[in-house]
Every structure is written in C-alpha cells, then in structure tokens.
C-alpha cells in the first residue's frame, strides 16, 4: 500500500466522521463515489459488509430486503454471494447509488434521507440491512424508529453500529424503548476491518444490532 493511498484514505475517513448534516453527506459522497470501493474499502480491508451479510443469512433473513445506506453496494454484493434474494437500495447520495446500480444486484434504488423519513410504506420489507451507516457524522439512534416502521411483522433487521458511536449517542436508551414495543433485540461485537488494514483505526469494532419484529 503506497503512502499516498494511505494518506488519502485517512483524510477521507476523518472527513466522513466529521460530517455534521445530511447536506454535508450529500456533498462529500458526491466526490468520493467513483473511488470509494478502491480508495476506502479495498485499502482498509473493510469487512463490515461481510459481517452484516453473514449474520443476516445465518438468521434466515428473507426478501424483499432493503439495504439502508447502501452506498456503492458492498453489502449487497456480500449478500448476493450467500443467497439470491430480492434487494432494494436506499442512500442519501445519488452518486453512490449510481455506482451500486452498475453492480446489478438491486432491483430498485431509492434516494432518501433516513433521518427525515423514507418514501416507503409501513411494514414493507421482510429484511433490512445496513453496514457503516450508523457511525460518526452519519446517522444516530433516532433513525431506528424509521427502520422499525418499514420492517414487516415477523421481519428481521441486521444493522451495524460503530461501537464508539453507540456509546457516545446512547443507542442503549433507544433500544430499550424499542423493546417496550415488542421488538426482540440482540447485540454482538465484530471487527470493522480485516487483518490487512494498517490504519490507526484497524482495531475499531462495531455492534451488530439484530431486530426481530
């Protein structure tokens, strides 16, 4: 890995973590979409999409599935390797979704802001997955209510949440509120990056939040 690639990756990741509004996210990912898979996912040995995908399939997740914060489709690719399920993608960045569409794994793409409500009817999806969206500078715990709104009765959601982000924003409090509505929730900790990652963040972890309606 060249020093130039390492430096560029580090700068972009820190910028992503420091975003403060939906508008910031749209602007930032507009300029990173075409290079994201190589510049970040490849260089960082980003295995979180694989972690989410394997958990979803292990728990017998079914379609149709909505990939929330789908980005360039890395999670969708991992799911498609394990099972052929109908998948839709949603992201705040149209440019990221355009890259995802080229992979041919989603039958529908929806540009939308999870924090403001998605243009989707209640109880639409049997499965909802998300990798890397609930993290610094992106989406907080309040968005879990929107996730549960569009999850069908008997459905399954598997969402990754950066572990530091979880504790700093109080995901536990929202999770307790969701449990009071009858949702079953489980949390496991996984690595975000693989053994090839050499960045300062190489040991960062995420919680896989599993919600059963």
Predicted regions and their residues:
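N-terminal auxiliary segments of SAM/dcSAM-dependent transferases
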Residues: 1-22
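Conserved SAM-binding loop and adjacent beta-strand
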Residues: 37-53
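Class I SAM-dependent methyltransferase SAM/SAH-binding core
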Residues: 66-117
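A short acidic, Gly/Pro-enriched loop at the edge of an enzyme's catalytic core
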Residues: 118-128
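A short glycine-rich, Lys/Arg-flanked "PGG" loop and its adjoining helix->strand segment in the class I
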Residues: 142-153
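Conserved beta-strand signature within the Rossmann-like core of class I S-adenosyl-L-methionine
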Residues: 154-162
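Conserved Class I S-adenosyl-L-methionine
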Residues: 169-190
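Class I S-adenosyl-L-methionine
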Residues: 183-213
């Amino acid at each position: 890995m060249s020093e130039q690639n390492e430096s560029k990756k580090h700068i972009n990741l820190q910028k992503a973590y420091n975003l403060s509004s939906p508008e910031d996210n749209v602007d930032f990912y507009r300029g990173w979409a075409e290079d994201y898979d190589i510049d970040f996912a490849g260089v960082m040995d980003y295995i979180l999409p694989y972690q989410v995908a394997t958990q979803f399939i292990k728990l017998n997740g079914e379609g149709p599935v909505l990939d929330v914060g789908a980005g360039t489709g890395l999670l969708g690719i991992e799911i498609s390797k394990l099972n052929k399920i109908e998948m839709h993608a949603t992201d705040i960045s149209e440019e990221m979704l355009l890259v995802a569409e080229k992979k041919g794994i989603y039958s529908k793409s929806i540009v939308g802001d999870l924090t403001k409500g998605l243009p989707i009817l209640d109880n639409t999806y049997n499965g909802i997955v998300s990798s890397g969206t609930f993290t610094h500078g992106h989406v907080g715990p309040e968005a879990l209510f929107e996730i549960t709104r569009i999850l069908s009765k008997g459905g399954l959601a598997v969402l990754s949440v950066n572990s530091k982000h979880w504790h700093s924003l109080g995901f536990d409090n929202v999770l307790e509120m969701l449990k009071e509505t009858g949702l079953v929730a489980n949390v496991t900790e996984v690595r975000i990056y693989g053994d090839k990652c050499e960045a300062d963040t190489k040991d960062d972890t995420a919680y896989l939040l599993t919600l059963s309606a």
